[in-house]
Amino acid sequence: TIIERDGRFLLVEEYADGDDLVYNQPAGHLDEQETLAAAAIRETLEETAWEVDVNAIIGVYYWTHPRGETYVRTCFAGTALHHHPDQPLDHGIQRAVWLAREEIALLGPRLRSPMVLRCIDDYLAGKRYPLEFFSYL
């Protein structure tokens, strides 16, 4: 989920693949019977302690890790509503940080995947699709 405030983007610093400390947007998996938008809101709260609302889809991204795992990411645009500084963060999350696009680009190999910067660039380019893009049957 892309949350932008005053030109800075909300990211998490997290452990991935053991000891590697990387940066990523708040992200995660669906719970049973959960919509994609609801999962984005829940995961952002759990990983950053920020309540957010989502208002658009930025895109759907398909990426294959060099190890062979394939990921499909749905990226949302949202708004920060309220911070809960005393809330513990999910296991593996070290901290939530606000960084400018230029600072994020300098992280290079410390980004969890190329999708991190691509989602931000698509957001900055104005790509937005309605939440109704997804149909739930």
Regions found by a protein language model. Name each.
Residues 18-23, 91-137:
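Nudix hydrolase/Nudix homology domain
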Residues 4-9, 17-19, 31-32, 77-84:
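Short, charged/polar surface micro-motifs in flexible loops or helix N-caps
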Residues 62-85, 97, 119-126:
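Active-site-adjacent beta-strand/loop module that shapes the phosphate/pyrophosphate-binding cleft
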